Amino acid sequence: MNVMQENQIKLIEHIKQAVVQAVGLEETEVPEILLEVPKDKKHGDYSTNIAMQLARVAKKAPRQIAESIVPELKKDNKLIKEVEIAGPGFINFYLDNAYLTDLVPVILTEDKKYGESDFGKGEKFQIEFVSANPTGDLHLGHARGAAIGDSLANIMKMAGFDVSREYYINDAGNQINNLVLSAEARYFEALGLESEFPEDGYRGADIISLGKDLAAKYGDKYVHTSEEERRSIFRVDALAFETGKLRADLEEFRVSFDEWFSETSLYEENKVLPALERLRENGYIYEQDGATWLRTTDFEDDKDRVLIKSDGSYTYFLPDIAYHLNKLERGFDVLIDIWGADHHGYIPRMRAAIEALGYSPNQLEVEIIQLVHLFEDGVQVKMSKRTGKSVTMRDLIEEVGLDATRYFFAMRSSDTHMNFDMSLAKSTSNDNPVYYVQYAHARISSILRSGKEQGLEVTKDADMSLLQTEAEYDLLKVLGEFADVVAEAAAKRAPHRIVRYLNDLASAFHRFYNSNKVLDMDNLEVTKARLALIKTAQITLRNGLTLLGVSAPEKM
């Protein structure tokens, strides 16, 4: 628990005791006391509507109740500097800012752990994201999903959740057959032999490279073997080639996974039919027109869904159900699936399947990643300058940089369409959101280096009571909010709240820097306190950027 949270608890307890004294209630009769941070700091550090909540019980107007509570609040409390009544009965609190300086040694001590909490209480979450077919490059939707998924996992972990990241490899569908046929055709081509290219094949340069690799590895060994043998071998190589490429691109994007789960393993380990039997045992399976159906309309889906077609082949829904059953059987409390915008209509049937399996539908959450449109100099960009084809994740990183790509994708709620301004992302000005935040970190690093060159080290025992200017207190207040913001971002599944916070923190630092001299050799004690203060800002900026997979540069 951080200093800010401790003070909130103290303040809530003080309000409760004031209500007991002023209104004559027992402690157990006092309703939950809610504290809000006013948008305008002129209205105090915190505000509560407890007087409104008590109006019915006390049979008085809220303002009259507030007037009876305020004198009790002013008694014997060093935390509160001033209390006032606003509007119909809101009670606004102005705290004694001295408590804020207690934050500095705490942040200096916690360092990389600053922002951690037990908010999640160790609840086990699995986040499955990206899960692109292993048949080509990652596109912009995948990139946005990767940035959101990885940032969310980082945030939830810091907030005290037990988080596992998973990539589901779609390696059992018809698209893999097309991949193998494409690789086979390019293999023959690399050997100088004629081969008909499949109508639905993959024509990318990577498949040409794969064909050359196969020719170099095997020579003409598989020219005259049976198709079954050749394609069985090429399937392994093609999947290894494509998944290796995906892994490399994602690692470059600073995204890693705890588990790469193969769809094929569901069949190899006999996980699909037991899932079907469980649905049947629970009474939600029926046969009609030679097909096997799941009665998802029992769970508010708009129509029932086919699991096995009349020709005996599975729909993609059945292995998806088996996969989600497997995830739940691994002991996760909640599953978070991050899907592309084209999967929005798939949510009701998947939640219905979860319930039909005997689990709560609340154990599945789905975050939808909306479309990304690229713009440069106000003009929409549809094709890569380098390849003349659709822009890939790799293209975007090469164009604007890794940090800007990660940060910009985290700036907006995932369920909103995004216009990605490449010109802004490349800008080295304060108009560029990631540059603005990184520059604050770099500037602090520069000041700390200058202080060190003059023999001034950051120390926890500096006299923090010397921090008394409004800009210093404002910076401290923002610093103290970090753990709460992380917990809120985790609870709301909203990485963009971290972006908003980092912008606020950078702004608070820049205001402080513009109005206070940090290195003042004529006032060493104040200098030491301010060095400690900016070090805490540096730590918090770094921790926040790390959550988003963005670097915190020492120099810019």
Swiss-Prot record:
Source organism phylogeny: Bacteria, Bacillati, Bacillota, Bacilli, Bacillales
Name recorded for this polypeptide: Arginine--tRNA ligase
One Pfam family this sequence matches: tRNA-synt_1d
PANTHER family: ARGININE--TRNA LIGASE, CYTOPLASMIC, ARGINYL-TRNA SYNTHETASE
Catalytic activity of the protein: tRNA(Arg) + L-arginine + ATP = L-arginyl-tRNA(Arg) + AMP + diphosphate
Subunit: Monomer.
Gene Ontology biological process terms in this record: arginyl-tRNA aminoacylation
Protein source organism: Listeria monocytogenes serovar 1/2a (strain ATCC BAA-679 / EGD-e)
Alphabetical keyword list: Aminoacyl-tRNA synthetase, ATP-binding, Cytoplasm, Ligase, Nucleotide-binding, Protein biosynthesis
NCBIfam families listed in its UniProt record: argS
Similarity comment: Belongs to the class-I aminoacyl-tRNA synthetase family.
